[in-house]
């Protein structure tokens, strides 16, 4: 689950993944097969099996890889360059993308990525992962005005049991998955440099098929009011939380839950201001790069519909730590955030409220997962600081320290928000 507006709690339930879009331009791929759906949390739990085969496996990095490949693939289909990505897109997947208009594609933004299903097949010795991606892209037909398209697609990935995961520095780069040669050296899924067929999933995740579930020029429904669900549900605590707390203290004796909660409070307040002021750059130090970029999808969706989502007097009432986890690259901590505030949507042309209430606060709870680099230990800061010189970073220094010039990759120096899940669907 990802943010919509600031906290996604209301608008998300009216989007295509949950209810349906407007009918303009909508279609369902006739060849779309039924997939048994699981909750994202259940998929993540099942994927822990991969760590026994592949110690470098990280769900966080896999989601980054999928997002990057999605952007590359749609950009390539607009320039008739899908063959270049044959190591990562099987013929059926390329054929589906190739059926879309072959016009230049720009500003591809993934607004949501949902893990749908995971299974292993001992007969083929492969893992299979199904994800759904919701996106916005701009097509630029020659001699015509640019057109924005909203889409929902289901991508099916496969990978051999013996394959190994990428390191963080390689997660967004695409080359021969066997020898690292440029993709220009591959033809029909075979690298001409190492003479190896590389599109079988033997070396990396490969897209076996793509189902185009919806595509339209009108975006998701962003008006109306939806009541909260799940706020009164009991908190879902991970059964291994006590042991995970002990292990966290062993890895990082300086970790302090109250300081961590202070970081959550700062992220909450910063996001609220950045969203309502339409200065989303201010939230960059708070979020993973993928999550930060995804929000421009929703900003653009509101803008194109002549709407503005407003949050006022938003405040956290209580925070509960519910889960701690770690892989080779990242540590993750999930909290349940109990909050309240005003949340409404107005038409920009006249200020008329078309969703929510301008004067009625609503209480809600969400599960937030924060991550930081596994290599970063030390006191948690409520404010961002440069990892090189320690200077406090202003919002204008979100990408580069204004004191020493060091590039700032948010999760390398402290906890940042990676995922938001609604209380009625969170299962641990």
Tell where the protein language model's regions lie, with residue ranges.
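Surface-exposed, charged secondary-structure patches
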Residues: 101-147, 303-350
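Core segments of small alpha/beta cavity-forming domains
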Residues: 27-106, 193, 197, 212, ...
């Amino acid at each position: 689950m990802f943010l919509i507006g600031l906290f996604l709690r209301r608008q998300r339930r009216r989007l295509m993944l949950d209810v349906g879009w407007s009918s303009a331009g909508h279609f369902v791929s006739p060849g779309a097969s039924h997939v048994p759906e699981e909750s994202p949390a259940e998929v993540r739990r099942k994927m822990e099996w991969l760590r026994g085969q592949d110690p470098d496996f990280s769900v966080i990095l896999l989601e980054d890889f999928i997002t990057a490949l999605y952007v590359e693939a749609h950009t390539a289909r607009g320039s008739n360059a899908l063959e270049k990505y044959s190591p990562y897109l099987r013929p059926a997947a390329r054929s589906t993308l190739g059926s879309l208009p072959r016009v230049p594609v720009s500003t591809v933004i993934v607004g949501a990525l949902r893990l749908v299903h995971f299974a292993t097949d001992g007969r083929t010795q492969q893992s299979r992962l199904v994800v759904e991606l919701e996106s916005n892209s701009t097509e630029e037909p020659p001699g015509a005005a640019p057109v924005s398209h909203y889409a929902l697609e289901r991508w099916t990935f496969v990978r051999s049991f013996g394959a190994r995961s990428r390191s963080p520095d390689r997660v967004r780069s695409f080359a021969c998955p066997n020898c690292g040669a440029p993709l220009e050296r591959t033809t029909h899924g075979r690298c001409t440099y190492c003479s190896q067929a590389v599109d079988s999933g033997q070396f990396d995740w490969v897209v076996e098929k793509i189902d185009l579930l919806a595509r339209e020029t009108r975006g998701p429904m962003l008006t109306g009011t939806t009541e909260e669900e799940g706020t009164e549900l009991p908190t879902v605590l991970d059964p291994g939380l006590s042991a995970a707390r002990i292990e966290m203290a062993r890895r990082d004796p300086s970790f302090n839950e109250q300081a961590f909660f202070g970081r959550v409070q700062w992220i909450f307040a910063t996001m609220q201001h950045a969203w309502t002021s339409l200065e989303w750059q201010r939230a960059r130090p708070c979020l993973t790069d993928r999550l930060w970029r995804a929000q421009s999808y929703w900003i653009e969706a509101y803008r194109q519909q002549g709407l503005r989502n407003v949050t006022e007097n938003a405040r956290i009432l209580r925070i509960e730590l519910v889960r701690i986890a770690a892989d080779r690259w990242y540590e993750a901590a999930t909290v349940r955030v109990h909050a309240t505030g005003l949340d409404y949507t107005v038409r920009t042309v006249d200020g008329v409220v078309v969703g929510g209430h301008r004067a009625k606060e609503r209480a809600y709870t969400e599960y937030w997962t924060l991550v930081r680099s596994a290599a970063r230990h030390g006191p948690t800061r409520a404010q961002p600081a440069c990892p090189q010189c320690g200077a406090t970073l202003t919002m204008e220094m979100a990408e580069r320290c204004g004191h020493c010039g060091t590039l700032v990759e948010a999760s390398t120096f402290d906890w940042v928000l990676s995922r938001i899940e609604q209380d009625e669907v969170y299962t641990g």
